């Protein structure tokens, strides 16, 4: 969270697997109730409805504006950032983003979705919040993570943002993004998760919890049977190999360019790929995109004298 005059800029990365802010990360999931539920962890109360945040993953949808879920998740993200600073009443500017090739088509609609209620009062985790959403801006995913160090991107570079739902690819040549060489594929880490579950069922007739698989993907190991671990590891290696195959289809050549990998899927490259660290950089900061959104909006406000 950044402060510009009397307004707080809050960057939010609306992921398909996790919601990220500059300082927080929580699972993208919303369960709505008409009455107060028994379990109240991460409970958000708004508009006479009760929402359990992060209870289970939201299904992938190319359109994040189909329902109220991402709006409610936005309120939870704002509350988490404000709570860190012990602020419960504030004017807020939202800095958000969309997959590279979807920005031009969906930017305005997503912006209107985020600012549809100027004044919002809600309760999250037992604390009341009163916020005024005074504006929002939407930026391209992936690129936001490198905006603070574009000076490192001399020559030809490929940027790859591996999320839960999508993989976004962009060329950055001589410190400038190439808008004509941007690609979005529905090949996020969720696809790997589905293949792992399928292989575990086919080979071992087992349905392990998603949390166990996630631990292997994040850390490369877990306290499970060796044969199960081998199946998960082998499937993850196949997925990573497929990532590099797709990158080559979009023009990646390790001898001609450097590769910069960001997003939650970066840990899979680190854990399951063999690569030259002098040619491939993996940014493990899962909050880097949200931080980048904040920086981009801050720079815009400074340049425009406070105008969006």
Give the location of each predicted region:
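PRPP/pyrophosphate-binding module of the type I phosphoribosyltransferase fold
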Residues: 169-174
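Ser/Thr-glycine-rich phosphate-binding loops at phosphate-binding pockets of nucleotides
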Residues: 162-168
């Amino acid at each position: 969270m950044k402060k510009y005059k009397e307004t707080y800029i809050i960057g939010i990365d609306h992921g398909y697997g996790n919601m990220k802010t500059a300082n927080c990360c929580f699972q993208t999931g919303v369960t709505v109730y008409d009455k107060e539920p028994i379990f109240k962890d991460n409970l958000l109360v708004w508009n006479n409805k009760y929402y359990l945040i992060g209870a289970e993953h939201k299904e992938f949808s190319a359109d994040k504006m189909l329902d109220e879920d991402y709006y409610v998740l936005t309120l939870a993200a704002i509350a988490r950032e404000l709570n860190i600073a012990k602020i419960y009443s504030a004017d807020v500017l939202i800095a958000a983003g969309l997959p590279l090739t979807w920005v031009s088509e969906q930017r305005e609609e997503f912006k209107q979705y985020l600012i549809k209620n100027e004044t919002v009062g809600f309760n999250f985790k037992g604390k009341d919040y009163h916020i005024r959403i005074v504006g929002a801006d939407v930026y391209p995913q992936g690129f936001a993570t490198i905006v603070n160090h574009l000076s490192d991107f001399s020559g030809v570079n490929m940027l790859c943002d591996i999320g839960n739902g999508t993989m976004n690819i962009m060329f950055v040549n001589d410190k400038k993004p190439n808008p004509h060489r941007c690609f979005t594929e529905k090949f996020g880490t969720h696809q790997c998760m589905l293949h792992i579950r399928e292989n575990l069922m086919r080979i071992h007739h087992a349905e392990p919890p998603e949390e166990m698989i996630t631990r292997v993907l994040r850390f490369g190991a877990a306290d499970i049977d060796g044969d199960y671990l081998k199946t998960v590891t082998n499937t993850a290696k196949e997925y990573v190999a497929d990532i590099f195959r797709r990158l080559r289809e979009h023009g990646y050549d390790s001898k001609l360019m450097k590769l910069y990998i960001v997003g939650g899927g970066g840990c899979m490259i680190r854990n399951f790929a063999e690569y030259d660290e002098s040619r491939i950089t993996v940014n493990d900061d899962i909050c880097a995109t949200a931080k980048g959104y904040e920086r981009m909006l801050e720079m815009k406000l400074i340049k425009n004298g406070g105008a969006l």
